A protein has these predicted regions:
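A short catalytic or substrate-binding loop motif that flags glycine-/basic-rich loops and adjacent residues
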Residues: 17-18, 57-60, 71, 116-119
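Phosphate-binding site of ATP-dependent enzymes
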Residues: 28, 34-90, 96-109, 126-127, ...
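Flexible, glycine/charged-enriched surface loops at secondary-structure junctions
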Residues: 53, 118-122, 171-179
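Glycine-rich phosphate/pyrophosphate-binding beta-alpha loops
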Residues: 18-21, 83-88, 92-95, 140-155
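Peripheral (often C-terminal) accessory segments that flank ATP-dependent C-N-forming ligase machineries
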Residues: 163-256
């Protein structure tokens, strides 16, 4: 509370239950932060007894350490670094690369070990290249939006989860192989939405720069062996956009 009263610091206010970047607002400390919290409680009809979580804003790249545990036993682990995100304020990544970071991985495993975790989880971190410092952000206890990257890099979490459940954790662990490093995956439709968001913010040149210098090894939603995924996803977003007049709408129940 003492640090949050410092008006020179920047903070992130996050609803306790949100959807990607929805339910997240940025603010200076002190009176500005208090006003932001009051505004979130009113706008999202939150319970004042469960106000948004306040975290100090941290600069740096977004990383994720994804794991499968079985009653406290680690079965598989995979690390990726975010290169682009759907909207400027954060949220789902549209471009990311398989990578490794020993410090983050050790911290993630230490936390899940202590919790005797069971099931899937992705732990998010921020890493500041200038200082080498990394900071833990949150745990997502579910399958994650960038699951295609782990599959493309050789870590099939759904299959390993199935094996752990049907044949036991030892069998699942025997099928795990460390990920190939440097594999890049792009969410094609999400990248289009990202460009629309940039254009909406007046960054037209960036929005229209299609050659970003990154070669994708895989696309989340464009597969030769399953081509209807892209069409189905496109139809879903088009219908939602026509209904809500937004490509990233806030719908009932998303933030609470």
């Amino acid at each position: 509370a003492g640090r949050a009263s410092d008006a020179s610091r920047e903070y992130v206010a996050r609803a306790r239950r949100g959807n990607s970047s929805k339910g997240v607002r940025f603010s200076r400390g002190g009176d500005a932060l208090a006003k932001t919290l009051d505004g979130m409680i009113e706008d999202f009809e939150l319970d004042p007894a469960s106000p948004p979580i306040v975290q100090e804003r941290v600069a740096g790249d977004g990383w994720g350490v994804s794991c499968l545990y079985w009653h406290g036993q680690r079965i598989a682990s995979f690390t990726h670094r975010r290169l682009q995100e759907k909207v400027a304020t954060g949220g789902t990544s549209t471009l990311r690369v398989s990578d490794a970071h020993a410090g983050m991985e050790a911290d993630a495993h230490r936390l899940l070990d202590a919790l005797e975790w069971h099931g899937l989880a992705m732990l998010e971190f921020k890493h500041d290249p200038a200082t080498g410092r990394h900071v833990f952000i949150e745990v997502n206890p579910r399958l994650w939006g960038s699951i295609d990257l782990s599959l493309s890099a050789g870590v099939n979490f759904p299959w390993l989860l199935y094996l752990a459940h049907t044949r036991g954790p030892a069998v699942a662990q025997a099928h795990f192989q460390p990920a190939r490093q440097g594999v890049v995956a792009r969410w094609l439709l999400g990248d289009m939405i990202r460009r629309l968001d940039l254009a909406r913010r007046g960054q037209f040149r960036t929005a229209l720069t299609f050659a970003d210098g990154v070669h994708a090894d895989s696309f989340d939603d464009a597969k030769w062996d399953d081509p209807l995924v892209l069409f189905g996803e496109g139809f879903y977003y088009l219908a939602k956009g026509l209904r809500t007049h937004s490509m990233n709408p806030l719908e009932a129940g998303m933030v609470r």
